[in-house]
């Protein structure tokens, strides 16, 4: 009976269970299962349950108290299961809210899962220099977050490399690849915010928004003032900033300074080290950048310490050489005496040194007979020809009193006793170590070691807010009106501003102050503005700013930041502050803001022609063609080269200087931009599974996005069912994936359209000073000379139509690069726009791109292996074209400088013959104009334009008081003349007179008044008016090594002038040949004098000849006529 009752009970329970399951199954067929989102990159899968997170509204209404409503809805929706709505419907957020229902709710009372990461399951997905990208899971829901605080993330997965804190210095992204080398200070995660359907919800510093995540290179941002320094020791400059925190650092272009930014508040002092004064470093502080000028600290210290004493300055500056001379003297006298005295007591030291250096000693002893100065070890001086006695070189140790009859080292006999032993035997070791040559070498090494110890002890040197009327303001970042006593953003308005058609009314809450004023708002602003703060913004800043305020909130207003050094408008300043908040609204505007650079760090050193290092050549002609002298000049097309020509004819008294300087040579490439490619940092996946139906059924809840979509069906069968889903061979899982790109490592791909050889050539001298760009296509021509390029090399391996890559290091790369819209497996995928938006990718993912998993009663998951095309890893196959970084001009062309000759530069100069004749009368100069622009006592100088009319053709010398000129001679033609002249002045030459001396004749001077001088001090960190800087420049100009080198080559100018472009090379060859010739004659003269003195040939001798003796055939004095009958005496004990 008990068994029957038990069976009856089991049957009843089974029937009840089946009935209940049928009811639940019927109910669930009309409901979708919860969706999950999975992010995976590499070995780090991340699973999202987005049934609630995809309902997160945007942050468009945060400025007007809607953040409370948004967070409240977020909590309610995460707890309430509901049907997943279409993405377009989710993005429509009502702006109007009822603030009365929100005032009792505090933001702090609402849960924030991103801030509670320490108590929840979390995982670090990416770490940049200034923030972190992570996910937090709570009740099956995963939230994506980007934060600039590491607090509470220590227990997260992958937190091993997480820093304790991130730097709080403000930064903005760099979009120009050319600027990354100069201003990059690390990376930062940004949120490109937009409301398109391919984006996804994400939280930045607890503020929810919709967008994508992008890793960008960043530069410093902020108001910073750099105080100039006169560079007197200790080379310190001061920086100040009104902001609460600011960053600065010293950076060399291309250097990795990711974690070297120094934060400060208020003011700070920076002392430059000697390495920073090499002319290659820049001081970066906020928006400002300043080039640290090249300064020889050792020289400048000496100039300052021994000012006005040229002898002491010279001794101080050259103290490094004086140190070496002192050590050489110490080694030659006291140290050598000490070593000779301690040779016997320190025999163990020499045995040890001989053992260590035995291979070197063996080689030197065997090759000694081939050395030029081999006899110097015996006390004799010779160059090549003299022979030495073998015993002098090969004497054994003092333990043996006899020398070897024949020196084994120098012997050529094959049956010598020592040849029976190996080179490594003890016999050879004792012989080699104990030769006089080896002992002398070991003593010399000992002396050098002692000298280096002493040398190390010798010192190195001898020596924007918006105001209503009076007290009511709008401050960016605060959604309420505040009073002048503003300290932090309040919870409600502190004042009221009513903008009417004819007047403005202002009132301060809590007081009886009401002020009226005229309506002086910005005109022609047609937009709707209802609240008081909106009306004020429309009135003072305009509708464009109001649109940003309403739709693009500022989470942090940076009220102390004005960005005055960049000259931005109010809208630009607002967008810059949004970038500081980590939000990118528009790539084009971001590119414009990040491309603004305040300071001189990008300024190129426009140096004048370095005449002191250029070769000189004299040209003499007396033939006249069409009334002109024609000079045909050829120069090698090599950057940095040039020649100074001294032009004259047989009748002229003074030569005319004509300088040709090739500033740079390279290839100008015209290109068209194709796309940008970057590595994938991580991947975001969003999918939705259904229990029954197919892909069409799934797409009703998960709409197609247009690219990188996928759908898997069927997904419901036995063994792969979610709870209470019993469908067989039905169901589908559909969704999409989005990549997060590391724009910091992006490459821009260009197609080469055209290549042309160009040269920047500067002409100075009698024609004034001017620089022109000459191409191989069109010859350059003016009234006095013509220039043409004959190229040997055209494009150096870059062919027309080839794809090239401009890398993050500003170098150019070539190789196998994929064409646009070509899915080939070569470098060039993913293909993106500048801001990381895909322009070519897979429309639908294939089966090999992903995998999915399920369980009998668990939820389904999708793993994305490759979201679109990814061939960035093939960049290792690219070849770097040039070692010189390049800059692109408007993404349409670039100049690739070359350091080798590309051909020949041919110049034809036609000078009127009247230039070489004495003028018959004083010329008449009219309509004169001399205007200058530049700085005083600086390397740039004053750039002046001299214009006048002349009634004669002549050559003239020019001068002006207190100024040195780039050229002191001009070729004046009849009629209109225009010259570019650079003047370096110690005083303002305004209203002074420049004097022209026709044909150098001081009796007929012509004066030209300086009409206008505009002084523009360069924005740098050194005061060029410092007397020490002036004295240093004077010292350097007076002690140029290049000037001395040119001076010693000058005797060969006449011969070398016949070799054209090989002028300087021939001078060097002739100088070297002359030096060797002098040494050879000195060697012969020395040998003759020594023999003359040694044999006393200066005494008169008479020889009595004996008739009985046969005639002596050989001379009395012959080599080796006297044979040594005993070994040389040892005097070492006397030393």
Swiss-Prot record:
Annotated stretches, region: Signal for signal peptide peptidase: 437-484
Superkingdom, natural source: Viruses
Site (Cleavage): 484-485
Sequence intervals crossing the membrane: 315-366, 1068-1088
Keywords: Disulfide bond, Fusion of virus membrane with host endosomal membrane, Fusion of virus membrane with host membrane, Glycoprotein, Host endoplasmic reticulum, Host Golgi apparatus, Host membrane, Host-virus interaction, Membrane, Signal, Transmembrane, Transmembrane helix, Viral attachment to host cell, Viral penetration into host cytoplasm, Virion, Virus entry into host cell
Residue pairs linked by disulfide bridges in the UniProt entry: 122-156, 224-285
Stretches for region Non-covalent dimerization: 177-195
Residue runs in coiled coils: none
Any single GO CC term annotated in Swiss-Prot or TrEMBL for this entry: membrane
A Pfam family it matches: Bunya_G1
GO terms for biological process, alphabetical: fusion of virus membrane with host endosome membrane; symbiont entry into host cell; symbiont-mediated perturbation of host process; virion attachment to host cell
Keyword Signal among record annotations: yes
Topology, Lumenal side: 36-314, 485-1067
Cytoplasmic topology ranges: 367-484, 1089-1135
Placement of sequence motif Cell attachment site: 41-43
Signal peptide per UniProt: 1-35
Glycosylated residues (UniProt): 116, 210, 588, 605, 980
Extra information: Tospoviruses are transmitted from plant to plant by thrips as the insect vector.
Family statement: Belongs to the tospovirus envelope glycoprotein family.
Record remark: domains: The cell attachment site present in these glycoproteins may help in the adhesion of virus to cells.
Protein name as catalogued: Envelopment polyprotein
Native source organism of the sequence: Tomato spotted wilt virus (isolate D)
